[in-house]
Amino acid sequence: MGQNGTVQPTQLVIITGMSGAGKTVAIQSFEDLGFFCVDNLPPTLLPKFLELVKESGNKMNKVALVMDLRSRDFFDHLFVALDELAEQEWIVPQILFLDAQDSTLVARYKETRRTHPLAPNEPPLEGIRLERQLLEEIKGRAQIIYDTTGLKPRELREKIVRQFSVHAQSGFTVNVMSFGFKYGIPIDADLVFDVRFLPNPYYIEHMRPKTGLDDEVSSYVLKWGETQKFLEKLLDLLAFMLPYYQREGKSQLVIAIGCTGGQHRSVALAEYIARHFSADYKTVVSHRDMERRKEAHR
């Protein structure tokens, strides 16, 4: 029930994505959040399953399902079911797509000594490439995309809890992420901004081991005229764009701010941007690569 006594729509999260990207950790995290969870539900059974959910009388008002390419009839039945769900008022479906860079997925397969389900007799990379092609359409329909490259299982759980816990369910989220271009562009980013043109604290020796979270580094990055002019233009652009992204029904917008190593400039600016919009939007800030460079100086 809602605060005014009305019945709240059932929340349905369909978890899918690349094999090895973290679907098992994800479904366990949703179970911890009180979701009714089903792993590897065949798409042909989705309509019947949802009938049972509806007949439960809101007793199953939070449902998470893992659906992947282990079911060969994945696409035809899933897309039909999703189109039908879009017309239903009693349920709010979301697709959570888990992805990771190919090199990360290969490393995970080697670590677990498992074969890829789509190419059991081939090197993992062959199966990964095939799966990525087959999943392209469902990824395009996903409301939420998580890049689990570099994420530990605990960090993925924390990410899910932040977004899907009861206290986090207030709609549109602005996710501001810093990263280093030398480690690759985040594959879950909606908008990417390059701040490598700004003065770099890395070349000041005593600042090199610090990060953009340190006041001295942040002040250095923000003091320059070009930084202030860039922020003025960027914040104005984002203030214009965010309401339109929200109107399109996106549950989150990932804004990625990149510098060379993801330790100084991008961190300071990501923090600044997140603070700026926190009064009007639910904001989350994360620093994908900050610890990589920091640990190198220990």
UniProtKB/Swiss-Prot annotation:
According to UniProt, the name of this protein is: Nucleotide-binding protein GTNG_3015
**Any coiled-coil regions, as ranges:** none
Residues noted as binding GTP in the record, renumbered to the chain: 68-71
Q: Which positions does UniProt annotate for ATP binding? A: 17-24
| Function field | Displays ATPase and GTPase activities.
SUPFAM superfamilies, from UniProt? P-loop containing nucleoside triphosphate hydrolases (SSF52540)
Similarity remark:
Belongs to the RapZ-like family.
Provide a Gene Ontology MF annotation, just one: GTP binding
Statement: the UniProt record of this protein carries the keyword ATP-binding:
yes
The answer to whether keyword Manganese applies is no
Keywords (alphabetical) are: ATP-binding, GTP-binding, Nucleotide-binding
NCBIfam families for this protein: PRK05416.1 (NF003828)
In terms of InterPro entries, this protein maps to:
P-loop_NTPase, RapZ-like, RapZ-like_N, RapZ_C
